[in-house]
Amino acid sequence: MSTSDDIHNTTATGKCPFHQGGHDQSAGAGTTTRDWWPNQLRVDLLNQHSNRSNPLGEDFDYRKEFSKLDYYGLKKDLKALLTESQPWWPADWGSYAGLFIRMAWHGAGTYRSIDGRGGAGRGQQRFAPLNSWPDNVSLDKARRLLWPIKQKYGQKISWADLFILAGNVALENSGFRTFGFGAGREDVWEPDLDVNWGDEKAWLTHRHPEALAKAPLGATEMGLIYVNPEGPDHSGEPLSAAAAIRATFGNMGMNDEETVALIAGGHTLGKTHGAGPTSNVGPDPEAAPIEEQGLGWASTYGSGVGADAITSGLEVVWTQTPTQWSNYFFENLFKYEWVQTRSPAGAIQFEAVDAPEIIPDPFDPSKKRKPTMLVTDLTLRFDPEFEKISRRFLNDPQAFNEAFARAWFKLTHRDMGPKSRYIGPEVPKEDLIWQDPLPQPIYNPTEQDIIDLKFAIADSGLSVSELVSVAWASASTFRGGDKRGGANGARLALMPQRDWDVNAAAVRALPVLEKIQKESGKASLADIIVLAGVVGVEKAASAAGLSIHVPFAPGRVDARQDQTDIEMFELLEPIADGFRNYRARLDVSTTESLLIDKAQQLTLTAPEMTALVGGMRVLGANFDGSKNGVFTDRVGVLSNDFFVNLLDMRYEWKATDESKELFEGRDRETGEVKFTASRADLVFGSNSVLRAVAEVYASSDAHEKFVKDFVAAWVKVMNLDRFDLL
């Protein structure tokens, strides 16, 4: 029978001939554009976490809901939960303290100070990949144990806050005094797609510590939070782990003392789990069958839980009192001699060979065992610098307690930004340098003050390009990941930002603005810098024939140099800023990808990014004053010329050299070079998504819309760190 007969017959019987195969016919299935073009520009990263994914709606106010919370009632419920052992996941020694501490630690421990991404501030442990990370085995059980409490308190407490608070309560209920707790972490409702977890395709692929210093990666192996507890690449060598430990904790902004305190404090309570071979453990939550309902790692070893639990494959209990705070970690570390052994699962660990059996069994009170340690625990004894700190903590338990309390607070709050974002009754009063503290406002300019300042700025002799450049340089350091940077504080005038190459032209305007501030005697330099941008944009729009008002919210303050951690602020120096046509290094990604990265850090959408780049170019705001991307003969006028000329087919573009970083736009008829451009310019004509937006702004009826959109995006960037306006 012919093919046509087959089709005819199936149609005759009421069956669609194209629906008879086994292909997945659901939305999103099949080969995607990224399968065909894996290097396609990730413009989609600018569309994350929209209201379309948020079930609470755009009017939901978490801070307002939190104010209704019975905070101490919640803590009381968490305390009770700690000792309410559940048969489906029995508690070690009748306490979930160690489990909840690990949950909080691993939620916060994804933070990287290099790019400010990761951390506990968004509740990302609920989603892939972190919910199925090899280092997060069994934390699905911790989150599920918390569900009745989350259900009870509803939206008055976010998952993100609850994870960290549960860790704090676990410590407190074990006899430890924490430094405090700041709430304010708002949940998101889908995975972060912008976090670069690394290029490795296989779990637990080893990375050299030197590589970590050059990339925004938080762990030494794909799928770990920090380092391999068995030593680098399962080496079993404590001393060789020191470099890896310093690299990973250093990437979180931790020094040696904080690192020692965190490792020891985190290993004072609880245990690891390796009752049997990890081959008995089933798929992670993302791969588990639907009937598992979001849980994973089901084990077929014995009962699979309690005494038979398998998590990391390591079977370590550090202290004699694993549910009560003590200094036993350091006492055992230095008191005994340690020999390498293997867990029942075959993982490398150490046992105190000369110790008596003093460690209680988690489920059988009649049993005892010898103290055990991870390979990386012994690093604190054998690395010379770590040893000095560890011996000091051994001899001064109070110093250890204080160091751990502060380091734990830093770990769990590092990605929350300034203290003004913290809410709740247990926020510490002390300002900490890593919070980028700011002084209290002493004066808020009146409307007349603002008018007078605008006149002074307009008459200062600074060009539109200079006014716009100085404001952008101040505000554009903001990072949406950890809420650092921004215009508030005027740290552009301080070290290290004042000396950054990218700011060389912008800071030339500072003496003029500082003089205006001095003469005003009231306004902050931070406000004046942003107001300079307002004046520049309004002048540029007026020159284009449009009378506009750029919104301005006063109230910024000026930070002092002693409130500015130079080393930590160095991390805000951009590798590239496509908005200013700046790129410092050519060995890191493509120029256009780095533009997307910068826009995502500034929480911009694709249209906002497009409008800002187009406007910055015609305003002549390139970092070095170059003409790259300045597709206009009327610089300083807020026109849509950038888009009109970029999309004009009269011009063809050719790279100036093999690097293909710079290009010339020549008239097709005369061959005359009309414009020059970078990849950050041409991407708006090359990438199909960005071109679609550029075509809107290049249209004959788009000038007013472009100016309106540019102003809205500009004001957004200027106010990104104005958490007091929320």
Swiss-Prot record:
Q: Which PROSITE patterns match?
A: PEROXIDASE_1, PEROXIDASE_2, PEROXIDASE_4
Q: Where is this cross-link: Tryptophyl-tyrosyl-methioninium (Tyr-Met) (with W-105)?
A: 226-252
Cofactor(s) in the UniProt record: heme b
Cross-link (Tryptophyl-tyrosyl-methioninium (Trp-Tyr) (with M-252)) at residue(s): 105-226
Q: Report the active site residues.
A: 106 (proton acceptor)
Site described as Transition state stabilizer, positions?
102
| Enzyme Commission number | 1.11.1.21
User: Reaction catalysed by this chain?
Assistant: H2O2 + AH2 = A + 2 H2O; 2 H2O2 = O2 + 2 H2O
Gene Ontology BP annotations: cellular response to hydrogen peroxide; hydrogen peroxide catabolic process; response to oxidative stress
Q: Where is this region: Disordered?
A: 1-33
Keyword presence, Metal-binding = yes
The question of whether Metal-binding is a record keyword is answered with yes
Briefly explain the null phenotype. Answer: Cells are more sensitive to killing by nalidixic acid, the effect is mitigated by pretreatment with 2,2'-bipyridyl and thiourea, both of which inhibit hydroxyl radical accumulation.
Top-rank taxon: Bacteria
Which keywords does this chain's UniProt record carry? Heme, Hydrogen peroxide, Iron, Metal-binding, Oxidoreductase, Peroxidase
What are its GO cellular component terms? cytosol
Give binding positions for heme b.
Answer: 267
**Subunit structure, as described in the record:** Homotetramer.
What does the sequence similarity comment in the record state about its family?
Belongs to the peroxidase family. Peroxidase/catalase subfamily.
Q: Which PANTHER family match?
A: CATALASE-PEROXIDASE (PTHR30555:SF0), HYDROPEROXIDASE I, BIFUNCTIONAL CATALASE-PEROXIDASE (PTHR30555)
Q: What is this protein called?
A: Catalase-peroxidase
